[in-house]
Each structure stands twice: as C-alpha cells, then as structure tokens.
C-alpha cells in the first residue's frame, strides 16, 4: 500500500495523498479517478479502455468499467513457477499443494475437456462440490473457457440446489458423490439423482 500511496502522490499531487486515511478519502471522494488509476496500476490484464469507470444508475442499472473485458483465470494463472498456488487441507485425505505451473497445466487439461464436451463462451456450468482444490481447478477452467460459473456446497438441501441451478440452466455439472464432515462420510449420490 505504501508503494501505491507514493505512486498516487506523484501522479495526483493536488490530491495530497500521503497516508492510508488520505488514500481512503481520495478513493471515496474521487472514486472514478481512483478506480481508473488502480486498474492500470494493479497490472490486471484486460482488454478495452478504463473509461468510463461507471455508467447507469441504481443497483441493477450501474455498470462498472463497461468497456473493460478481463478473464479471471488469465489473471490468476499468469504467475509461473514452482511456488505454491493452491493448498488443500482436508480431514478426509492428505494435505495437497499445487504449484503455479501445475495449476496452469491442470486448468488447461480441464479447459480442453470442456471444449471437447461442447462448452462455448457464455455457456453456464454448475458445480455441486465442496471447497476443495478440484473445485478451484474447475472454476478456473470454466473462466478460461469463457463460460459462466455457479456452485453450491453439497451440504445444501436438494431443493435449494435445484432452485439455484434451474435459474441458470447449466450445460454441464461438476459434482462429488460425497464428502467428509466431522469424521462422518456424507453420501451425496441420492441428491445427484434428484439434480
């Protein structure tokens, strides 16, 4: 944050940003200026232009960076190397670690499988999965493919899952057949039949 404050003080000297409080004040009072600068400064990979920052009004009518297109997976997977990108800790299996290089390879593999299944940009994919590394890989592959993601934890009631997924009409469903909670194996196969 100190580096960004220094950047802002040089780029916008008339805003007198010198510390956290003045940065916060600037970001609220001049939010369009702040967000436009932050988008470029942050190094987020995007296509388009950072102007305008905001269009429309009201909760449903407002568009944030309407001329910007970005891909979540592209931004998260741009880091290379063997440092840990993803760690999974579970009571049901050994702890897992996945490097950035391995994560990119796994996401690419799943993305290719999605294309082989006929998934196209804008298609919807749902997941009935817990918070495990495989879920992260699936959501990144979905994003990389340009598809839309929705998920529910397997501890949701069946009707709640059906209600959510019916709204988006997914073309593909990622799921688990069970999970472990407090040492107890929870079988999800009957829920899957209903889904």
For each feature predicted by the language model, list its residue ranges.
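N-terminal amphipathic, basic-rich helices that act as targeting or association modules
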Residues: 1-60
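Conserved AMP-binding/adenylate-forming core of the ANL superfamily
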Residues: 22-26, 73, 86-140, 157-162
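A short N-terminal helical cap/helix-turn-helix that marks the beginning
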Residues: 28, 36-50, 66-87
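Structural core segment of the AMP-binding/adenylate-forming
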Residues: 144-195
């Amino acid at each position: 944050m100190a580096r960004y404050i220094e950047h802002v003080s040089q780029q916008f000297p008339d805003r007198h940003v010198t510390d956290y409080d003045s940065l916060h004040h600037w970001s609220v009072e001049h939010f369009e200026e702040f967000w436009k600068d932050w988008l470029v400064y942050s190094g987020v990979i995007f296509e388009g232009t950072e102007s305008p920052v905001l269009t429309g009004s009201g909760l449903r009518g407002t568009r944030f960076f309407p001329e910007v297109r970005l891909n979540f997976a592209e931004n998260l997977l741009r880091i290379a190397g063997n440092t840990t990108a993803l760690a999974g800790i579970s009571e049901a299996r050994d702890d897992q670690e996945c490097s950035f290089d391995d994560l990119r390879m796994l996401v690419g593999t799943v993305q290719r499988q999605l294309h082989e299944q006929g998934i196209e940009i804008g298609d919807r994919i749902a997941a009935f999965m817990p918070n495990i590394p495989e879920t992260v890989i699936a959501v990144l592959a979905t994003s990389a493919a340009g598809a839309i993601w929705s998920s529910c934890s397997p501890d949701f009631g069946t009707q709640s899952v059906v209600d959510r997924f019916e709204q988006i009409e997914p073309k593909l469903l990622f799921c688990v057949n069970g999970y472990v909670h407090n040492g107890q194996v929870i079988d999800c196969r009957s829920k899957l039949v209903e889904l």
